[in-house]
Amino acid sequence: MKNILLLTILSALFFACREDQEQKKEASKPSTTKLAQSGLGMVAAAQPLATAAGNSILEAGGNAADAAIATAFVLAVVEPTMNGIGGRNQILVRQADGSFVGYNGMTEVPASFVPAEEPPNAGYGTVATPGVVAALMRLHAEHGSMPWDELIKPAIQYASEGFEVLEGEAARHAYAL
């Protein structure tokens, strides 16, 4: 009886671990979708509308900082459960001379805030001021080349006219309800 049980378990493991030829064939097919290509730069984001907005800024003559700002604001509109202006960010810029500069868009508490001895679990003591917009504004001031209103125009358009909510974002909204 023990031998039959052992043989059954080993057989199940063998067949469960063997390679699925159909999945292998499907996975080995190259993608025929061209997502983005550029000789000077490109944008990649978690949401195609945000990627398109950043790439359109590059095509209009903007630089990487401009594209990052446009992309960030579109993400805040079209994928607010994962990206937004009400949170924090860190930005790393490689400058033309090869050096790096960082922008810390972390949340902060007011300078006059006196923390309690025990960290609060609820109430105003648990809330900090978002740093995303301040960091993006500083990035723009130091590296941007296009007017701010041009950079946020795509986000305003999607917020005003609407857009198709992708499946993952819809699922996150449904989960929150």
What positions do the PLM features span?
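Positively charged n-region of N-terminal signal peptides that target proteins for export
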Residues: 1-4
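C-terminal motif of bacterial Sec signal peptides marking the signal peptidase cleavage site
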Residues: 13-16
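Noncatalytic scaffold domains of N-terminal-nucleophile
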Residues: 23-52, 64-65, 69-177
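Surface-exposed charged/polar residues within alpha-helices that form helix-capping/stabilizing sites
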Residues: 55-56
